[in-house]
């Protein structure tokens, strides 16, 4: 299949001129058929199918096969003899004599054999496209993205059009951070509770492609307001023995922070059995630094304004490793059973320092250090965390006589443990202020089950139904212990135990149909969510919360094939963002002497209605994809920061917090919680262009122009409107001698937030690759060429203004070595082995690409 994919682009380039020059009589009857690879029996999309004159071999008409290998030529006179030619770069041409007798003709299934001479003697420059456009998603082929070589999953996502990753590892899609991330079609939570940590543990070398699904069908988990990002890992490929080894070493340039990782995989397959195993490990250090300035108005300091500056430095180490092993049993040509295990361990030591200096603006204290503000201090933090996650999976796939009729069962069980310890020392400049030391220790046990059952049934060639069930269960038990001022005795006023259970049961049905050039899918998903949480503390009343949501999620997908090279899509879906237990728990966290954090038990889920209109066209050297989208979110959940005063607590409806933290009012502390605002609207236009400038030079340009409207009257009596944009450029040059040079540039324009704004960002990378004997690849990557990466933001409230400037040590140099071995032949296609569901599937009743 990989060889097939490599050759798609050049075939498209050659076909369009042929079809454009076709001349012949008016259409009379259609000629149709199906094309496959002779050895693997994989379908062959985008094969050139042409009809030639028997007399002089002139071109009569032509088309290309679709993604399922099917084709139909409509412009053929009803009677006569013709020669049908199938052509596809890397394959031997196939010729077939056909004779029409006034009726439509189906030539059946035609098989094409690879041409070893062609593959060895011709340099395939374009190979597989970096980005492929399918019915309801975009697929980014990671192996074509050199500037992420040697990095991790976050580096890969940074280079995906319309996707961004901030300095804390938060992922956004089209400017919205509420996105669902899947790993091999399964929730990323199966590998860890923190997404940023999970992404940092996945080497880029283990990723096959990234699927971006902006408006998923009812088959998918509706979590993720802006859509779904599915990270698909590499799997075994050929029959026989094959494998690969990847090694990476490098460092940040400004300061030595080593960045190393390695991975290895091996697979062996026969007609009846398959085995695969892989391991990977990482040792990375990252530095961080930020400068924060805050102006507190006179409400905060006895009638005096105050100016505070804090400078933060630190570094963290990511030491992680994992392994995966899988066994396949091909019971027969239509049935398979797969068992697999995926385990990961990680360690994450951190340390940092903060220097915070607060001055009263009237300088009434002069040089008397005894009168320094209580907020001027030196802060030292250290920490360490480690954990393990183990996932056991079973997949059963059964195809019937009609390959479109299929039953799939996918079950996953995950158990994990996590330990975290951190300490914080506050050394106040004011000698009359006692120093403060806090150490907290947390341990958690996690259990999670994900079960997906899907059955697809074709009623005819144009009508197909899919039904399914999805269970998502999680259970977590955590202990949080706090120790103050060097004491080894636990502080029972702050320590607690936390129990959390979540059940999500879902059923769904989709009906896909096609009529001529029009195809579509209607879907409906119903979910019942039950959340239960309980916090227990000694000598205090327990806090608990129980929530249930029953929600319908309709979806509509329409596609119209304007011509063989042009298509349009229209889709609608309803999405949900469920507040997590920490967001809702009526818990007040007083462990930080500078901040107060508490949950909001009155928070409700937010729902989004999303509409999208897309258009794509394939030209000889250009592919253009554009999409206009509109999303309206009701009951939007937003983080909210304010100065902790009694007046503000009552103003925003948090009177109950005063019973717990009433003694902390009017001390200049900041409070943070979440709440529902009325609504927000996000709309935009996305444009992606793949341009083959020359035979050896290709450019991908993407831009996203989007506007935001937020009704934030409940927070600051304002309606916030903004228009933002971002753009990415990727240039790939395939040079003689198996050399490749790739550069990328990314720009994110300034944008407004509910309580402030984020500054513009820009950075650029470059990479050079050398292929040796088609088995060894060397890649050198230089990240952040101009040292411009950074994150600057401003927060504005009625009580203070803060400015934050963060600069990561992103500029780095890394060298990657990759070795592939094995002489296996392509395998015969087996039934699919996983559900793209957190679960999920494709619109229009289509199947996922393996």
Language model features with spans:
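Short, acidic Ser/Thr/Gly-rich low-complexity loop/linker segments typical of extracellular
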Residues: 54-70
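Short acidic/polar hinge/loop motifs at secondary-structure boundaries
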Residues: 74, 159, 187-214
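Outer-membrane beta-barrel translocator/receptor signature
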Residues: 222-229, 237-291, 317-321
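Short, acidic, small-residue-rich periplasmic hinge/interaction motif at the N-terminus
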Residues: 36-39, 48-52, 85-91, 101-146, ...
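N-terminal periplasmic accessory domains that precede
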Residues: 106-111, 153-156, 195-198, 212, ...
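Face-selective signature of the C-terminal outer-membrane beta-barrel domain
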Residues: 322-346, 376-536, 561, 565, ...
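Surface-exposed extracellular loop regions of Gram-negative outer-membrane beta-barrel proteins
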Residues: 417, 530-532, 564-610, 630-665, ...
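Outer membrane beta-barrel strand-and-loop segments of large Gram-negative receptors
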Residues: 439-440, 448-452, 492-496, 501, ...
């Amino acid at each position: 299949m990989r060889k097939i994919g490599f050759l798609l682009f050049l075939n498209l380039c050659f076909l369009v001129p042929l079809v454009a020059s076709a001349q012949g009589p008016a259409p009379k009857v259609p000629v149709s058929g199906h094309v496959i690879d002779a050895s693997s029996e994989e379908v062959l999309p985008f094969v050139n199918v042409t009809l030639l004159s028997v007399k002089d071999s002139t071109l009569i008409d032509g088309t290309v096969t679709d993604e399922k290998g099917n084709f139909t030529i409509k412009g053929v006179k009803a009677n006569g003899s013709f020669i049908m030619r199938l052509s596809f770069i890397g394959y031997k041409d196939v010729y077939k004599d056909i004779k029409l007798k006034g009726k439509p003709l189906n030539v059946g299934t035609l098989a094409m054999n690879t041409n070893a001479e062609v593959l060895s003697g011709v340099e395939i420059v374009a190979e597989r496209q970096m980005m492929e456009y399918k019915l309801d998603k975009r697929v980014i082929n990671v192996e074509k993205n050199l500037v992420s070589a040697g990095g991790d999953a976050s580096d890969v996502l940074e280079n995906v059009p319309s996707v961004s990753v901030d300095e804390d590892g938060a992922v956004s899609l089209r400017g919205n951070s509420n996105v669902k991330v899947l790993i091999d079609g399964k929730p990323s939570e199966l590998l860890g509770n923190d997404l940023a940590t999970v992404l940092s543990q996945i080497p880029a070398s283990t990723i096959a492609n990234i699927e971006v699904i902006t408006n998923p069908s009812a088959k998918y988990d509706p979590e993720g307001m802006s859509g779904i990002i599915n990270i698909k890992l590499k799997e075994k490929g050929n029959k026989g023995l094959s494998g690969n080894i990847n090694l990476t070493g490098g460092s940040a340039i400004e300061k030595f922070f080593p960045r190393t990782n390695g991975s290895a995989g091996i697979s062996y397959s026969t007609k009846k059995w398959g085995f695969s195993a892989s391991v990977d490990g990482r040792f990375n250090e990252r530095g961080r630094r930020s400068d924060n300035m805050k102006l507190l108005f006179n409400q905060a300091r006895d009638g005096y304004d105050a100016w505070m500056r804090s400078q933060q430095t630190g570094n963290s180490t990511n030491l992680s490793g994992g392994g995966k092993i899988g066994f396949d049993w091909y019971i027969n040509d239509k049935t398979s059973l797969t068992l697999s295990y995926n385990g990961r361990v990680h360690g994450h030591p951190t340390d940092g320092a903060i220097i915070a200096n607060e001055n009263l603006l009237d300088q009434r204290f002069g040089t008397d250090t005894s009168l320094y503000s209580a907020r001027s201090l030196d802060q030292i933090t250290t920490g360490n965390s480690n954990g393990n996650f183990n996932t056991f999976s079973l997949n059963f796939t059964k195809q019937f006589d009609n390959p479109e009729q299929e039953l799939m069962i996918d079950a996953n069980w995950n158990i994990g443990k996590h330990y975290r310890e951190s300490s914080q020392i506050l050394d106040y400049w004011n000698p009359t202020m006692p120093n403060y030391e806090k150490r907290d220790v947390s341990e958690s046990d996690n259990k999670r089950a994900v079960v997906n059952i899907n059955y697809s049934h074709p009623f005819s060639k144009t009508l197909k139904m899919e039904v399914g069930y999805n269970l998502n269960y999680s259970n977590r038990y955590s202990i949080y212990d706090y120790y103050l001022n060097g004491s080894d005795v636990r502080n029972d006023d702050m320590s607690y135990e936390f129990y959390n259970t979540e059940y999500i049961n879902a059923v769904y049905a989709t009906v896909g149909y096609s009529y001529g050039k029009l195809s579509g899918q209607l879907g409906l998903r119903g979910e019942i969510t039950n959340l239960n949480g309980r916090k227990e503390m000694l000598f205090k009343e327990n806090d608990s919360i129980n929530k249930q949501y029953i929600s319908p999620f309709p979806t509509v997908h329409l596609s119209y094939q304007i011509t063989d090279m042009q298509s349009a899509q229209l889709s609608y879906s309803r999405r949900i963002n469920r507040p997590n237990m920490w967001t809702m728990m009526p818990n007040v966290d007083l462990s930080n002497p500078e901040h107060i954090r508490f949950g909001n038990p009155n928070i409700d889920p937010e729902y989004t209605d999303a509409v999208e209109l897309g258009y794509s066209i394939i030209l000889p050297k250009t592919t253009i994809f554009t999409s206009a989208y509109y999303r309206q979110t009701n009951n939007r959940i937003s983080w909210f920061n304010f100065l902790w005063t009694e007046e503000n607590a009552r103003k925003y409806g948090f009177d109950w917090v005063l019973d717990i933290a009433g003694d902390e009012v009017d001390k200049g502390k900041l409070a943070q919680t979440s709440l529902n605002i009325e609504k927000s609207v996000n709309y935009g236009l996305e444009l992606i262009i793949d341009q083959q400038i020359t035979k050896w030079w290709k450019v991908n340009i993407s831009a996203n122009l989007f506007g935001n409207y937020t009704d934030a009257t409940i927070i600051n009596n304002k309606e916030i409107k903004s228009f933002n944009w971002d753009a990415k450029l990727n240039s790939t040059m395939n040079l003689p001698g198996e050399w490749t040079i790739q550069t990328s540039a990314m720009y994110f324009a300034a944008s407004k937030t509910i309580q402030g704004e984020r500054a513009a960002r820009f950075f650029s990378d470059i990479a050079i690759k050398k292929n040796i004997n088609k088995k060894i690849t060397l890649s050198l990557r230089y990240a952040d060429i101009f040292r411009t990466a950074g994150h600057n933001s401003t927060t504005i409230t009625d009580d203070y203004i803060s400015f934050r400037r963060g600069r990561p040590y992103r500029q780095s140099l890394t060298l990657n070595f990759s070795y592939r071995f094995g002489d296996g032949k392509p395998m015969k296609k087996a039934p699919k082995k996983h559900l793209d569901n957190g679960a999920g599937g494709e619109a229009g009743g289509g199947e996922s690409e393996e």
